[in-house]
A protein has these predicted regions:
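N-proximal low-complexity "stem/linker" segments adjacent to membrane-targeting elements
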Residues: 1-30
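Alpha-helix termination/capping residues and helix-transition junctions
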Residues: 31-33, 63-66, 91-92, 100, ...
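Acidic donor-binding segment of Leloir-type glycosyltransferases
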Residues: 27-76
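Catalytic-site signature of metal-activated, phosphate-bearing donor transferases
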Residues: 79-87, 106-229
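Active-site nucleotide-sugar/metal-binding loop of Leloir-type enzymes
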Residues: 84-97
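Short, conserved active-site loop motifs that form the nucleotide-linked donor/cofactor pocket
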Residues: 9, 67-70, 126, 175
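Short beta-strand-to-loop acidic/aromatic patch adjacent to the donor-nucleotide binding site
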Residues: 94-108
């Protein structure tokens, strides 16, 4: 925590060629003013051949406007390497908490409630917590999006061909991190999927929104994730 008794909260964004989605995150003043740093890990994945649909200088232009952006170029890297980069940076910068919010997602805070929630989490041993996320017109569910430091864990490559690699997150001693989210549900019962009464952390909500991506890009994304663990 800082000397002002506030938390150092960072945001980790896995990004490529999605400036409108990123702008949706950055232009929420409540979110931008509260967080300490926004780590944008830029780059097209290894093995993807689709071309960018927007001008690649957009990201540079945004970094000149939004000083909290910390941009790292990792073009040609695997998803797992890109996601591990923001954990590495959060560890170096000694963030207290991290929120994972990709560029096809956005979020909103009630800062007073969020700070109260983070104080509650300080006393808990788990490092992963659920956030209520909406996919408009499709589903509402609690997802692992809030993480507590120290950020000594990393994603490990899955041994199963049909498992997305960033779903595996482990400490060096083999402790699994994502599953720690379920400890929250023991005293905050999990709700039915699509129920608006999801038991996520109070003070933060997220939305999944692909409307800024073209139909071709959404299809290319789906094909890539289906074929690449």
């Amino acid at each position: 925590m800082t000397s002002e008794n506030t938390y150092r909260v960072g945001v980790g964004i896995n990004y490529w060629d999605d400036p409108k989605g990123l702008i949706k995150i950055l232009t929420n003043d409540t979110v931008y003013d509260y967080v300490e740093k926004i780590y944008v890990i830029d780059g097209r994945y290894e093995g993807r051949m689709d071309e960018a649909e927007s001008h690649m200088d957009y990201l540079t232009d945004l970094s000149e406007i939004y000083s909290k952006l910390h941009i790292v170029s990792m073009d040609g890297s695997k998803q797992i390497a890109k996601r591990n980069k923001y954990w590495e940076l959060a560890q170096v910068d000694e963030m207290d908490y991290m929120i994972v919010c990709d560029s096809d997602e956005y979020m909103d805070f009630d800062v007073t409630k969020l700070i109260g929630s983070l104080r509650t989490l300080d006393a808990r041993p788990e490092k992963c917590y659920p956030v209520k996320q909406h996919m408009e017109g499709i589903s509402v569910m609690s997802r692992p999006r809030l993480f507590k430091g120290p950020f000594t864990f990393r994603h490990l490559q899955s041994e199963k061909d049909n498992t997305i690699s960033h779903g595996s997150l482990y400490e060096k001693d083999g402790t699994e991190i994502i599953n720690q989210m379920y400890a929250w549900f023991k005293d905050h019962p999990k709700r039915q999927i699509n129920s608006d009464d999801q038991s996520g952390i109070d003070g933060i909500k997220m939305w999944h929104d692909k409307t800024f991506r073209s139909r071709d890009r959404v299809i290319a994304d789906r094909v890539y994730y289906d074929e690449t663990p």
